[in-house]
Curated annotation (Swiss-Prot):
Protein name: Sugar fermentation stimulation protein homolog
Domain of life the protein comes from: Bacteria
Family recorded in the similarity comment: Belongs to the SfsA family.
NCBIfam families (UniProt xref): sfsA
Entries under HAMAP family matching the protein: SfsA
One Pfam family it belongs to: SfsA_N
InterPro entries the UniProt entry points to: SfsA, SfsA_C, SfsA_N
Molecular function GO labels: DNA binding
Amino acid sequence: MYLMPPLIPAVLIRRYQRFLADFQLENGEIVTAHCPNSGSMKGCAVPGSPAFISRCDKPGRKLCYTWEQVKADNCWIGINTSLPNRLVHNAIESNVIKELQGYHSIRPEVRYGINSRIDLLLSRGDELCYVEVKNVTLMEDGRALFPDAATVRGQKHLRELMEMVRLGHRAVNFFVVQRPDCSSVSPADAIDPEYGRLLRLAAANGVELLAYQAQVSRETIHLTHRLPVIL
């Protein structure tokens, strides 16, 4: 479980330059917030949408506000892509994810592959498990879809996970669905057909595909249950 910082109600005015978004606060003030999501945020960046932002006055920050959540399709969606790694890390430590139980060590951001860092490296003696975490916010017809924009980086990660399996290790591509209205996860072939091809190839070559739904609220975010990955 991840405890959210105090969240401030706001209304989205616009998102622009990928990492910036303007909001109107309840007192009418207009503020600019950092958008911690490099994807297209399709369906999650509609002007006029209710949102929650956080504030941090740490010295050196260019923007004191960060966009955390948005309300779309009558539900709250977590758009901060820095949170899923922490959610999965905490869930593994708490034995919430039964498929990843029994490991003695969890290390974040470990170098591997070609100039890459694995999100989480699990170990048990000489046994290694490489876990790549992906945040999912796009939904169509009750299915969570990834990615919401073409991702060369995501394609690279799948190739590197396949290489880890070839070397005799365990590798997992882990989807965190930060919205409650999805019953399954699938590749967004219409957006990035190459990612879809590589995801199917990775699954056929031993990379495990896991997906968990996250319960998003103003106070907390936590993983609740596994979702099927439909290829």
